[in-house]
Amino acid sequence: MSHTAEIPMVPGSESPLELKPLKAVDPKAVYHRRAQRLLSLAKDSPLADYFELCRRVVAIQARLAAEADFGQLLAWGKDEAIPLSHLGSEADSYWQGLLQQLLSDLLPQVGEDLARVLRLLMQQSPEQLTSWGASLRQGHMSAVPARFSLFIWAAMGVYWSHWAPMVIKRIDQRKVAQQNLCPICGSHPVASVIVDQPRAGLRYLHCSLCESEWHYIRAHCTSCGQDKGTTLWSFDDTQAQVRIESCDECHGYTKMMFVEKSPLMDVVADDLATLMLDSELNAKGFGATTVNPLLLAHETEQ
């Protein structure tokens, strides 16, 4: 029978000399792996149809990441905090172009009900899309019609993830302080990723928009930063591949993906596949402090 187990936590002593504050990823590889993982997880999921829709969206993201025109990297200062958080109208033009390509590719692959949604989104004005995109990036999910959010975020993700590695190469990582939002684009993390390189047990937060990863000390709440009152929870066994860290101070939680135990894991897909953990923590009075780009369409409109 399934159960939730509380796991004792031992704070680690990590030296910044042994790690990179920021890790860039190859978006093409990330999207390809995510699509494969969604295909695998769908086989045993009650959300198989939704997993398949997400897989198709992510597969298109992979193609766009490899083939699309992204223009030139927009101007930003090397000492600028969160450099990709306030790009101008030129960025809006490019990601909206990516959105049109994504919708055009997806349209022949879906049923008529969803096709009507896609066609309606394709007809929106650039000004409306700009407003919705800004609302999503600022965390105001209810300001955007839920049926459109998944696709808008997917297009923005392709654009921001293309430029993030180039920005990471150019900034002075020694100036990157520990923070709960992405140091590159300012978005929320999807979850924590526990890695075994450069040494076992290091934690990185994975960005929900630009796919960058940034180091965050273990046993500190990833939302409020407190190092007291954090608890690690597991489902079924204390060595599970996916666990949850909760905070008694802010009553938030974030999932932790132990990728060294399962190299095929993808932070977005496996977060989607473990919604039962969210239900367990919600029942205990905790709320998620993270964002999954494949769950944005499920945000409640107000």
Swiss-Prot record:
Keywords: Cytoplasm. It comes from the Bacteria. GO terms for cellular component: cytosol. It holds the Pfam family FdhE_central. One of its GO terms (biological process) is protein maturation. This is Protein FdhE homolog. Necessary for formate dehydrogenase activity. GO terms for molecular function: ferric iron binding. NCBIfam families: FdhE. It comes from Shewanella oneidensis (strain ATCC 700550 / JCM 31522 / CIP 106686 / LMG 19005 / NCIMB 14063 / MR-1). InterPro entries: FdhE-like_sf, FdhE_C, FdhE_central, FdhE_N, Formate_DH_accessory. Its main location: cytoplasm. The keyword Ligase does not apply. Belongs to the FdhE family. Gene3D superfamilies: FdhE-like domain (3.90.1670.10).
